[in-house]
């Protein structure tokens, strides 16, 4: 992977998007024309319209990811770097602090803390575990699970590497759910950390991955968020194993394809991402809208 900073001007970014969406449009148009030939002739006009509309929606979605994957394949084949990101050596020392956040809501405490311990041990092996702290942010409403969380936390603290702190906090009221949980953390403790890695309750991330994300954020001051593509693991059923295999085979290709045309304008998937705390606090607070959900609140 190239360590040089690749900057794309707006025109090149626009050209990338025109290519991907243009190919998607042409593919969908040709497929739709073919589809109209096989629609039963005795169908009503309304039925034909609905069949064509549903076909266009589903085929366009597939075509978008198909062409994104084609471009992603060549990006990986020629080892092109991510535009706008300067890659750094693996032994780059961190001078910043990162909080690893795991919001939970009536989860299995043993699994939550087992995953955190595994990640903490892996981080400690990198030799830079002291740059990270871990937080369990609980919105649990079940009293039994709440007690179990605290018990597991006390046990986990005894097993944690000495270089990494593990904190536990439960809110009495789970206002705004997960987003409110993250907001509460930022308001009370965000000033102590440069970055935060937001996990899901069942997330399991490699220590080297978390370290690399923190290194990239520290050395790319213009970057506000880096999203790690999630991958399914630990499945037992045949269907789950098939999903895991598929994700392993073409997951990186799809991710590279999305990065090809989204560049620096991608969306936050809700977890498995590192975020610049100060920028997040300054720019990502949303007002409460009038009216009832989903259009208000």
Protein language model annotation of sequence segments:
Residues 1-92:
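N-terminal membrane-anchoring/stem segments of glycan-assembly enzymes
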Residues 14, 67-297:
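Internal catalytic domains of large membrane-associated glycosyltransferases
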């Amino acid at each position: 992977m190239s360590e040089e900073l690749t900057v794309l001007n707006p025109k090149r970014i626009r050209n990338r998007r025109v290519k991907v969406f243009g190919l998607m449009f042409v593919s969908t148009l040709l497929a739709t024309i073919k589809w109209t030939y096989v629609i039963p002739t005795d169908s009503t006009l309304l039925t034909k319209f609905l069949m064509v509309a549903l076909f266009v929606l589903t085929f366009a979605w597939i075509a978008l990811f198909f062409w994104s994957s084609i471009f992603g394949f060549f990006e990986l084949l020629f080892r092109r770097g991510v535009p706008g990101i300067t890659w750094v050596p693996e032994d780059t020392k961190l001078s910043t602090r990162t909080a690893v956040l795991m919001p939970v809501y009536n989860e299995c405490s043993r699994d939550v803390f087992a995953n955190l311990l595994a990640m903490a041990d892996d981080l400690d092996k990198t030799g830079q575990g002291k740059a990270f702290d871990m937080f369990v942010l609980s919105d649990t409403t079940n009293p039994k699970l709440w007690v179990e969380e605290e018990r597991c936390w006390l046990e986990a603290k005894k097993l944690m590497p000495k270089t990494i702190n593990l904190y536990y906090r439960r809110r009495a009221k789970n206002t705004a759910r997960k987003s409110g949980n993250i907001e509460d953390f930022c308001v009370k403790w965000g000033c102590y950390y440069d970055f935060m890695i937001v996990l899901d309750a069942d997330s399991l991330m490699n220590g080297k991955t978390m370290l690399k994300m923190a290194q990239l954020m520290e050395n790319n001051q213009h970057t506000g968020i880096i999203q790690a593509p999630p991958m399914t693991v630990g499945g037992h059923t045949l269907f789950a194993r098939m999903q895991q295999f598929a994700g392993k085979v073409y997951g990186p290709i799809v991710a590279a394809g999305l990065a090809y045309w989204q560049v620096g304008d991608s969306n936050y998937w809700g977890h498995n991402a590192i975020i610049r705390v100060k920028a997040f606090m300054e720019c990502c607070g949303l007002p409460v809208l009038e009216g009832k959900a989903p259009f208000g609140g």
